[in-house]
Amino acid sequence: MLKMGVLLFTFLVLFPLATLQLDADQPVEQYAGNKQDLNPDEKREMILPALRQWQCCTMAWCDSGCLCCE
Protein backbone atom coordinates (compact mmCIF):
# COMPACT_ATOMS: atom_id res chain seq x y z
CA MET A 1 0.00 0.00 0.00
CA LEU A 2 2.86 2.38 0.82
CA LYS A 3 4.51 1.70 -2.54
CA MET A 4 1.26 2.54 -4.31
CA GLY A 5 1.03 5.84 -2.39
CA VAL A 6 4.58 6.80 -3.28
CA LEU A 7 3.96 5.93 -6.91
CA LEU A 8 0.74 7.97 -7.06
CA PHE A 9 2.38 10.94 -5.31
CA THR A 10 5.27 10.88 -7.75
CA PHE A 11 3.15 10.81 -10.88
CA LEU A 12 0.28 13.02 -9.71
CA VAL A 13 2.25 15.73 -7.88
CA LEU A 14 5.97 15.76 -8.67
CA PHE A 15 5.83 14.99 -12.38
CA PRO A 16 3.31 17.78 -13.23
CA LEU A 17 5.29 20.30 -11.16
CA ALA A 18 8.48 19.50 -13.05
CA THR A 19 6.66 19.81 -16.37
CA LEU A 20 5.15 23.20 -15.51
CA GLN A 21 8.53 24.60 -14.49
CA LEU A 22 10.03 23.67 -17.86
CA ASP A 23 7.15 25.31 -19.74
CA ALA A 24 7.67 28.57 -17.87
CA ASP A 25 11.30 28.80 -19.02
CA GLN A 26 10.62 28.61 -22.75
CA PRO A 27 9.17 32.10 -23.50
CA VAL A 28 12.11 33.81 -21.80
CA GLU A 29 14.64 31.91 -23.89
CA GLN A 30 12.67 32.60 -27.05
CA TYR A 31 12.47 36.34 -26.26
CA ALA A 32 16.22 36.52 -25.59
CA GLY A 33 16.90 34.77 -28.89
CA ASN A 34 14.76 37.28 -30.77
CA LYS A 35 16.61 40.22 -29.19
CA GLN A 36 19.99 38.87 -30.29
CA ASP A 37 18.86 38.81 -33.91
CA LEU A 38 18.31 42.59 -34.04
CA ASN A 39 20.77 44.52 -36.12
CA PRO A 40 22.57 47.50 -34.50
CA ASP A 41 20.30 50.07 -36.17
CA GLU A 42 17.18 48.48 -34.67
CA LYS A 43 18.81 48.37 -31.24
CA ARG A 44 19.73 52.04 -31.55
CA GLU A 45 16.14 52.93 -32.48
CA MET A 46 14.95 51.31 -29.26
CA ILE A 47 17.62 52.82 -26.99
CA LEU A 48 17.75 56.44 -28.19
CA PRO A 49 14.14 57.36 -27.27
CA ALA A 50 14.76 56.03 -23.78
CA LEU A 51 17.88 58.17 -23.45
CA ARG A 52 16.02 61.30 -24.58
CA GLN A 53 13.55 61.10 -21.69
CA TRP A 54 15.89 63.08 -19.44
CA GLN A 55 16.55 66.75 -20.09
CA CYS A 56 19.80 68.49 -19.29
CA CYS A 57 19.67 71.41 -16.81
CA THR A 58 22.16 73.84 -15.35
CA MET A 59 23.17 73.44 -11.70
CA ALA A 60 20.88 76.32 -10.63
CA TRP A 61 17.77 74.63 -12.07
CA CYS A 62 18.58 71.04 -11.20
CA ASP A 63 15.57 69.05 -9.90
CA SER A 64 14.11 65.57 -10.26
CA GLY A 65 12.82 66.25 -13.79
CA CYS A 66 16.24 66.70 -15.37
CA LEU A 67 19.88 65.75 -15.12
CA CYS A 68 22.48 68.25 -14.02
CA CYS A 69 24.88 68.66 -16.92
CA GLU A 70 27.99 70.79 -16.88
Curated annotation (Swiss-Prot):
Pfam families on file: Conotoxin
Annotated signal sequence range: 1-24
Cystines in this chain: 56-68, 57-66, 62-69
Subcellular location: Secreted
Organism: Conus pennaceus (Feathered cone)
The record's note on its domains: The cysteine framework is III (CC-C-C-CC). Classified in the M-1 branch, since 1 residue stands between the fourth and the fifth cysteine residues.
GO cellular component, as recorded: extracellular region
First-listed, main subcellular location of the protein, grouped into a coarse class: secreted
InterPro entries from the UniProt entry: Conotoxin
Identification of the protein by name: Conotoxin PnMLKM-013
Residue ranges the record assigns to the propeptide: 25-42
GO MF entry, a single one: toxin activity
Similarity comment text for this entry: Belongs to the conotoxin M superfamily.
Tissues expressing this chain: Expressed by the venom duct.
